[in-house]
Structures are given as structure tokens and as C-alpha cells.
Amino acid sequence: MLSPKRVKFRKMQRGRMRGVATRGNTIAFGEFALQAQECGWITSRQIEASRRAMTRYVKRGGKIWIRIFPDKSITMRAAETRMGSGKGNPEFWVAVIKPGRILFEMGGAEITPEIAKEAMRLAQYKLPVKTKFIALDEQQKQSAAEAPAAAEAVNVES
């Protein structure tokens, strides 16, 4: 399972998940991807379960990229422990996910859209956040449609 080799501080604050993902929200390596639709924490166990589900379905067909890494420690106190006496010990690691973040990518010569969609569907069941399947050509069409609109907005202002 994934976890950092070493960290500067073992115990972290929980934090808040606001806004959308500004980084890691485009397909970078493969042709198909699984994109988060809501915010949440994904544990290293859930990432591993999703990875196994996808690799078992595609067998040796293509390549899978994991685009998230669990770098936040979650601490827990022992059961039936009184309040006080400090923060609990780190129990597991999570990746903080915001809407729009690409979680997994898939590509390769043998990977068809149908195979990729089914493999990603199996991975979706293992995750605690809503996700959607996207393809590289869909993303390029969407960004091409947004580019002229942004250019018109600049022309109107000047």
C-alpha cells in the first residue's frame, strides 16, 4: 500500500476541502481516466483495491497510472481512552480529493473504450467519492470549446 517514506511532521490537522482541483485535473499520460466529481478522502487501501480491480480486468492489456498519492496521516485514539493526553497515533494515510481531480489513467494499444470503461467502473465501486469516466478526445473537445469563449471575453474587456 502507498504511504510516504518519511515526513517532516507525523501528525497533521484534518483541514477543510473547499473549491475544485486546479492541478491534476487534465489527462496527462493515458487515453482514458477516472475523474472525481466530489471531495473526500481516499485511503491507501481504497487506492490499492481500485488498482487491483482494474489490473485484473485488463490483464496484461495496457498501462495504468495512479495520479493520486496518500500523503496525509489520519490519527486515531485507542478505544475507551479518556479525553486529553495529546493527539492519537497515525493509523492510516489518505489522499485529499477535490472535484475535477484525475484519480486513475489508462492507456495502451490493446485498451479499447469499452475495456477501459468497464475497468474504471469496477474501480469506481471501491472508491468513496462519485467519479466519472472521461476520454482524452472528449477532454480536448471540451478545452477547444472553452478556448474561443475565453478569447471572446478578453476581446470584450479590451
Curated annotation (Swiss-Prot):
Q: Which residues cross the membrane?
A: none
Q: Which CDD domains match?
A: Ribosomal_L16_L10e
MF terms in GO: rRNA binding; structural constituent of ribosome; tRNA binding
Does this UniProt record's set of keywords contain RNA-binding? yes
GO CC field: ribonucleoprotein complex; ribosome
Alphabetized Pfam families for the sequence: Ribosomal_L16
Which one GO biological process term can you cite for this protein?
translation
Please verify whether the record's keywords include Signal: no
Q: Read off the Gene3D superfamilies from this record.
A: Ribosomal protein L10e/L16 (3.90.1170.10)
Arranged from A to Z, the UniProt key words for this protein are: Ribonucleoprotein, Ribosomal protein, RNA-binding, rRNA-binding, tRNA-binding
The entry's family comment says: Belongs to the universal ribosomal protein uL16 family.
Q: Describe the task this protein carries out.
A: Binds 23S rRNA and is also seen to make contacts with the A and possibly P site tRNAs.
Q: Give the record's subunit note.
A: Part of the 50S ribosomal subunit.
User: This chain belongs to which protein, by name?
Assistant: Large ribosomal subunit protein uL16
The record's gene field reads rplP
